[in-house]
């Protein structure tokens, strides 16, 4: 399979950064150099804390009273882990935004529903969004991320100027960011009350 890893790194980073009005403090889990490279495109980010995938729940607990604007979770290891979501949410400010890897809403429906329900029990806005993972047998393979937000909406509150005028994107732009949240009617109906717009 031809890898398009840079697309996931851009979509999991720039969607939440450009949803939040003033993201200054960011926490990443399993993002490493991929996410840091994307965050380096923004001069206004003042602090980035990286946690490893293994032991992330304990790592969150050990951060103390810090507050973050954006959380980027590059793994889906914790997407259906209530303790993880609770500890992560404690570290976000009242308008915090989370982007996290999740199950595919077409091919892993039961898992995706459980993940969305869990996040939706904590956040008023919970929406899956698509990105292209790679090319396999000349077919484009799509996967999903989730944006969970306490206040900002990813399509209504997107900072268009920041999304389109920041240098260095290979894939991401405001049109892609908005279109990534589009879902077919039959999927929207199946996830009615679970996807929280």
State each model region's role:
Residues 60-72:
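A short acidic, Gly/Pro-enriched loop at the edge of an enzyme's catalytic core
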Residues 138-197:
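SAM/dcSAM-binding transferase cores
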Residues 103-119, 139-140:
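Conserved class I S-adenosyl-L-methionine
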Residues 1-45, 55-59:
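Class I S-adenosylmethionine
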Residues 81-96, 120:
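A short glycine-rich, Lys/Arg-flanked "PGG" loop and its adjoining helix->strand segment in the class I
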Residues 69, 73-76, 101:
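Residues lining the SAM
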Residues 95-103:
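Conserved beta-strand signature within the Rossmann-like core of class I S-adenosyl-L-methionine
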Residues 86, 111-133, 146-148:
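Conserved Class I S-adenosyl-L-methionine
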């Amino acid at each position: 399979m031809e890898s398009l890893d840079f697309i996931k790194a851009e979509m999991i980073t720039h969607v939440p950064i450009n949803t939040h009005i003033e993201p200054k403090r960011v926490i990443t889990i399993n993002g490493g150099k991929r996410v840091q490279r994307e965050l380096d495109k923004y001069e206004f980010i003042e602090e980035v804390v990286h946690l490893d995938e293994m032991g992330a729940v304990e790592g969150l607990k050990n951060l103390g009273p810090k507050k973050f604007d954006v959380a980027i979770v590059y793994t889906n290891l914790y997407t259906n882990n209530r303790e993880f979501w609770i500890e992560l949410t404690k570290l976000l400010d009242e308008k915090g935004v989370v982007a996290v890897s999740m199950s595919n809403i077409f091919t892993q429906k039961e898992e995706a529903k459980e993940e969305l329900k869990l996040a939706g029990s904590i956040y008023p806005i919970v929406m899956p969004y698509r990105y292209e993972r790679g090319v396999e047998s000349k077919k484009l393979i799509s996967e999903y991320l989730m944006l969970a937000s306490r206040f900002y909406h990813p399509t209504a509150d997107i900072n268009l100027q920041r999304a389109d005028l920041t240098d260095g994107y290979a894939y991401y732009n405001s049109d892609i960011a908005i279109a990534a949240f589009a879902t077919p009617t039959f999927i929207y109906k199946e996830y009615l009350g679970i996807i929280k717009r």
